[in-house]
Amino acid sequence: MKVTITSIDQVLPSVEITAPKSLALSHIDEWHSRGRSSLVWLYPKPKKPTQSLQLLDHLRSSLSQALNKFPQYAGKLSHSLQTGTSQKSKTRLCLTWGTGNDPGVHYITARASSPIDALLPPLGTSTGFTNGSGSYAWDRSGRSCIGLWPAVPLNKVYETCIQITTFECGGFSLSITMNHAVADATSVILFARHWSKTHELMVKVQTPSLSIAEPCFAPHLIDQYSTLELQDEGDNGKLLNKAHALPTLRNDLYESGARSLPDRLELSETYSVGDDIAVGDWERSGPMRSYMLHFSKEDINKIWESAKKEAGQDVSRQAAIVSYIWLAIIRAREWDKHGVCEPIKLFITFDVRRRLGLPDTLLGSPVLVTHVKFNGNDAISKSHGLLANRIWKTLSTYDVESVCAALYDITSSRPLISPAIWLGGRSTLFSSLCHADMYDVTFHETGPLLAAPAFAGMGGMIGLIKSKSAVPSRLPETYEDGIDMFFELDTESSIKLFSDPALSIFDGRALLQEFRQ
C-alpha cells in the first residue's frame, strides 16, 4: 500500500496561553523517555457527503480545541536543574509549553492508494478464518498499518505526532504517536476520546454533551509515593533491598555482551543502545509476519476454566489467555528445547494508577514492568494453568508498599532502554489495554472499524485490547465481545504455531494454505 504525504502542519491550542509553564515529569515518566506510545484507528467513510468534504478541516480544528485541555502536548521536553525538598539540585526532565516557541503537534495528512477494507479482517468473505464460537486468526502481514503512523523521530522537535490518512473509498485513519514520558497508551486513549467528543460537538451542535473525566496532569502525585515509606534516612537501604527483591525490570538486569542490531529496526536517536544490552536472536528470526487473534467470550472462558483446573482459582482471564499464547509461541520457536542454560522470560507492563488509588485520568506513564521466567525443562513450560498462576501471583506481589519501593528505586535509575533494543531472543513483552476502551473514539458519528497498537518489526511484543463492543454502554473491562491480541512472528515459527493442536480454536488451515502458495 502506497501512502503519500499531502501536508505537514503545526497545530497549537486554539486558546493562547498567556504565560509559559514548566513542570518536572515524575521519575517514572522520565524512566520511559526513550520509548514511544503509538496507536491507530481506522474509520469508514463519513455518512454525509458534506462531512467527507470537510473531514480534514474539522479534524484539524477540533484537535486545536481539544489541545486547550492538553496544552502540554504541544510543548517540548528538556532537562533542567531542579532543587528538591532536601535543597540538593538534580537534573530533571521537564515539559515546557506556552513559550511562544512551542513546537505544537506535528500534524500530517496523507493519502493511501487503496481502499480501507484492505487493512481489515476478511470476515464474511473467508470463512476459513473463523470457528463456530467466533474466534478467528487473521494474518495481517503487509496490512499492519505501518504507513499510517508518523515516521517522525520524537525527541527531536516534537513530542506529539498525528497522521490522518484518507483512502480511495472515503474512509480514513487516525494515528497518534507520543513520547512515552509524556503519555502511556492510557493517556493517549484519553486524549483521543476528548478529541473525539470535541469534534462531535463541533460538527453536530445538537449532540448532547457526553461526560468524560477531565485530564489530570500532576506528575508530583506519582513522585510523592516514591518516598512514602521513608521515615528516616536509614530507610532508603531497606526500600532499595525490597525493590531489588521484586522481579521489576531494571537496566542492570540486562545481560552483558551487546551484539549488532538488525538493520530493519531503523533506529533513530529516539532509541539509545546504552551499555551491556542483550540483543537476543533477532538475526535468526528474520522478517516478521503480523497477526491478530480474536478470542470470543466463549473461548476466553474455556481457556480460563482450563487454567483453573490445573492451578486453582488464583488465575485471571488475561493471565490465562497470555500464558496460553505465550506457551504456544515458545513451542513454535522451540525455546523449550534449549535446556536449563537458556531462561525464557515474559515481561509484563502494568499500570500503577489504581494500585496507588490515583485516577485513570492521570496523564504520563505510571507504568512498571515486571517479569516471569523459567527454563525450558521446567514443568511450568508444559502447563498454561501453572504459568497463568505464576503470572497472577507475580502481579499480586505489587501492593502499595512494593510499588512505592519500585518507584523509589527508579528515582536513581537511568531511563529504561527501549524494547526495540532488548526484545527478541527468548524474551517477550506483554501489554494489555483492556482497561481502556480504544473503540470509544467516534468521529462524524461513526466508531472505528479497527483499533490497534502500532508496532511493526517487533517480534517480541504481544498487545491485548478489548474488542469492539456491540453495546457501547458496556463496562470497559467486560469480555462480552471478546478480546483482540496482536503479535508478530517469523514465518518458520508461524507455520509451527498454526499447526499446533493446542490452538485448534483458531482454524489455521487458511493461514497454512497461504504459506504454501
From Swiss-Prot:
| InterPro entries documented for this protein | CAT-like_dom_sf
Q: Transmembrane segments in this chain: where? A: none
| Record's keyword terms, sorted | Transferase, Virulence
Pathway it works in:
Mycotoxin biosynthesis
Q: Where is the active site?
A: H180 (proton acceptor)
Highest taxon above the source species: Eukaryota
Q: List the disulfide bonds.
A: none
Q: Which GO terms describe its molecular function?
A: transferase activity
Q: Pfam families, per this entry?
A: Transferase
Q: What is its EC number?
A: 2.3.1.-
State the PANTHER family in the record: F21J9.9 (PTHR31623:SF17)
Q: What else is known?
A: Gene clusters encoding host-selective toxins (HSTs) are localized on conditionally dispensable chromosomes (CDCs), also called supernumerary chromosomes, where they are present in multiple copies. The CDCs are not essential for saprophytic growth but controls host-selective pathogenicity.
Q: Which family does it belong to?
A: Belongs to the plant acyltransferase family.
Main role? Acyltransferase; part of the gene clusters that mediate the biosynthesis of the host-selective toxins (HSTs) AF-toxins responsible for Alternaria black spot of strawberry disease by the strawberry pathotype. AF-toxin I and III are valine derivatives of 2,3-dyhydroxy-isovaleric acid and 2-hydroxy-isovaleric acid respectively, while AF II is an isoleucine derivative of 2-hydroxy-valeric acid. These derivatives are bound to a 9,10-epoxy-8-hydroxy-9-methyl-decatrienoic acid (EDA) moiety.
Q: What is this protein called?
A: Acyltransferase AFT15-1
